[in-house]
Curated annotation (Swiss-Prot):
Organism lineage string: Eukaryota, Fungi, Dikarya, Basidiomycota, Agaricomycotina
Swiss-Prot/TrEMBL catalytic activity: ATP + H2O = ADP + phosphate + H(+)
Enzyme's top EC category: hydrolase
Motif (Q motif) on chain: 40-48
Skewed-composition ranges (Acidic residues): 340-365
Location of the Helicase C-terminal domain: 249-487
Source species: Cryptococcus neoformans var. neoformans serotype D (strain B-3501A)
Keyword ATP-binding found: yes
Record gene name: DBP9
PANTHER family, per database record: ATP-DEPENDENT RNA HELICASE RHLE-RELATED, DEAD-BOX HELICASE 56
Boundaries of every Helicase ATP-binding domain copy: 52-238
Listed name of the protein: ATP-dependent RNA helicase DBP9
Length: 627
């Protein structure tokens, strides 16, 4: 079975140190330590144990550590501590007392919201001395209002921060701490130019002296090395390699399948509970996410859809509820906007070379045809002129660009996710590393399973086909090389315990469900979901502010029901169960063990006497006879 137990592990923790003992107990304010204890921070992780003391000493730090290793606390705790120390030496009446002293730059809105939430939890016992504001989302007018009080910590994306600095809505004259989280992603999203303009000494936005820098990244790419000189001065470089026990917590598998059989496999995995615990299913576009959700709903599998079309508050609320155990399955759209330009260029170059060789003869034929067409189409003499040939019309399909600051695959802290399923293989190896980084976090074990479509199987079924699957084999080779290089491990092929043929018994049920999920119904579900989430996000915002407990009753996994409902698909017959998986102890996987035939008629206890009469031959009753 594909089940993986989420057993806690100390592989990522440094047991030699404790937040309640020196040096941390003497370096960090007691109010911050109590807040950390409330969040179950007993021992620091490796990156926290190394980075926090260095940052508190005033040194710049460049740290490379995998996702889920606790990088957020490694820079937030020193930032809060330095603000508390600075305010302790100033009078509350002084003009310098309330000022923005720390800037946190992140690549996505979701990560900004998460960092803001963590910062508020860390400072909850500081009596309002440390104010934190997230300006990554929201309009300019709202951001100006938030910045009027000169918050101590501002969390933003580089583009938003640059806009605020240009409009003079934010002053950084008292800035003393600058942290960049997920630096490799921030650069891959195209924020390098914005970051360069922010750090330009001629602009005068960032003080030339007295600003401590911190760069956190999952990888140390050439781009990260390139901006090191912009942000850091003589930094301490931490390249933290995890012990073998930590890297082995993630079990990575793949299986070759057709585009249609993806739906069969995901149905078998989830409905028969071959993967236990909470799962994140990644797809490559928004339409694909709704198609998977509607398909799974046919079998009674509840799941949430998360994509950049939904309001930020809804997306973040889904993550919080997933972490609390409210939802077990999330279908997340990872459109990979702007990621890994170099790798994509290499793929395009390879494709262009192969296509160029094949199209040489076609180009020559096309040139000859053009010459013949020009000779035949010479304009006739006279005042009337032929209408000029119009340029080729643009395709009618509306090309929707993904929001580069919205992604659940990158930097978001999913806790206790036991598995990640790449329903659609990502476009690049970097995207793969960040997707599988959503599981096996904080010392817990995890499983990653990827569906790979062979080139010869791509495009055979247009109804369920996706363009990105055409490159699955090339991308997967890059993924295997990178996994081998960075973690010295291999992605193993999943053999389904030699019983993949027995899955065919479920195919007819998959076909029935997939036929009901048409393109029209997917579009209807897409509109309904956005409308519903906008209503929840905007109309009820004031209500939830006054009644925070009511927010826990807001559900995101409600069935969309635009597809034809087939209730029999929700129950798996018992004759199918033993062939693929053992029945779990304590009951059947199915909601109902079986439905037997009843001898009773539709009207209840009814016999030959007609409606309401007793069964068998009885004495006839004369309705006119007086009793």
């Amino acid at each position: 079975m594909l089940s993986k137990s989420n057993q806690p592990s100390d592989a990522l923790l440094d047991a030699d140190f404790s937040f309640s003992q020196p040096p941390f107990s003497t370096l960090i304010d007691s109010r911050v330590l109590v807040a950390l204890a409330d969040q179950k921070f007993a021992h620091p992780t490796l990156v926290q144990a190394k980075a926090i003391p260095l940052l508190l000493e005033g040194k710049d730090v460049l740290a490379r550590a995998r996702t889920g290793s606790g990088k957020t606390a490694a820079y937030i705790v020193p930032a809060v501590q330095k603000i508390l120390e600075a305010k302790a030496d100033l009078s509350p009446a002084s003009a310098e007392y309330q000022a923005t002293r720390a800037i946190i730059l992140v690549p996505t809105k979701e990560l900004a919201l998460q960092v803001s939430s963590f910062t508020k939890n860390v400072t909850k016992y500081c009596d309002g001395l440390v104010q934190c504001v997230d300006v990554a989302a929201g309009g300019a007018s709202i951001q100006r209002v938030l910045l009027n009080d000169k918050p101590d910590i501002v969390i933003s994306t580089p583009t938003k921060l640059l806009s605020l600095l240009q409009s003079k809505s934010l002053s950084l004259s008292q800035l003393s701490f600058l942290a960049i989280d997920e630096a490799d992603l921030l650069l891959s999203y195209g924020f390098k130019d914005d970051l360069t303009r922010i750090m330009d000494p001629t602009s005068g936005w960032i003080p030339k002296l007295g600003v401590q820098g911190c760069l956190m990244s999952a990888t140390l790419s050439d781009d990260v090395e390139g901006i090191k000189g912009l942000v850091l001065r003589n930094p301490a470089i931490l390249t933290l390699s995890e012990p073998a026990s930590a890297s082995s917590l993630l079990s990575q598998h793949y299986t070759h399948t057709s585009e249609r059989d993806k739906f069969l496999l995901i149905y078998v995995l989830l409905k028969l509970k071959l993967i236990r615990g909470k799962s994140i299913i990644f797809v490559n576009d928004v339409e694909r996410g709704y198609r998977v959700k509607l398909f799974l709903e046919q079998f009674g599998v509840k799941c949430c859809v998360v994509n950049s079309e939904l309001p930020l508050a809804s997306r973040y609320h889904v993550v919080e509820e997933f972490n609390r155990g409210v939802y077990d399955v999330v279908v997340a759209t990872d459109e990979g906007a702007g990621a890994d330009a170099e790798e994509e260029e290499d793929v395009k170059q390879e494709e262009s070379e192969s296509e160029g060789e094949e199209d040489e003869d076609d180009d020559k034929e096309a040139e000859d045809k053009e010459k013949e067409a020009k000779e035949e189409a010479k304009p006739a003499p006279g005042p009337s002129k032929r209408r000029a040939t119009s340029p080729p019309s643009k395709p009618n399909k509306r090309a929707r660009r993904a929001d580069p600051t919205s992604s659940l695959a990158r930097g978001i802290d999913f806790t206790s996710a036991s598995s990640v399923i790449n329903f659609d293989l990502p476009l690049t190896s970097t995207s793969y590393m960040h997707r599988v980084g959503r599981t096996a976090r904080a010392g817990q074990s995890g499983l990653a399973l990827s569906f790979v479509v062979p080139r010869e199987n791509w495009g055979k079924d247009k109804a369920v086909s996706i363009k990105s699957a055409e490159k699955d084999e090339k991308v997967f080779e890059r993924i295997k090389e990178r996994v081998k290089k960075e973690s010295d491990s291999e992605i193993k092929e999943w053999d389904w315990k030699g019983r993949k043929g027995e899955i065919e018994g479920f195919r007819y049920r998959m076909e029935d469900a997939l036929k009901a999920v048409t393109g029209k119904r997917v579009a209807e579900a897409r509109r309904e979901e956005v409308r519903r989430e906008l209503l929840n996000s905007e109309k009820l915002k004031s209500h939830f502010a006054a009644n925070p407990l009511d927010l826990s009753y807001l559900r995101h996994d409600a069935p969309l029901h635009p597809a034809r409902q087939q209730t029999h698909l929700k129950h798996v017959p018992n004759y199918l169960m033993p062939k693929i998986a053992a029945l779990p102890t304590g009951g059947d996987v199915t909601d109902h063990a079986g439905v037997g035939f009843s001898r009773r008629g539709r009207g209840g206890h009814r016999g030959r006497g007609g409606r309401g009469s007793k069964s068998g031959r009885g004495k006839k009753v004369d309705p006119l006879k007086f009793k």
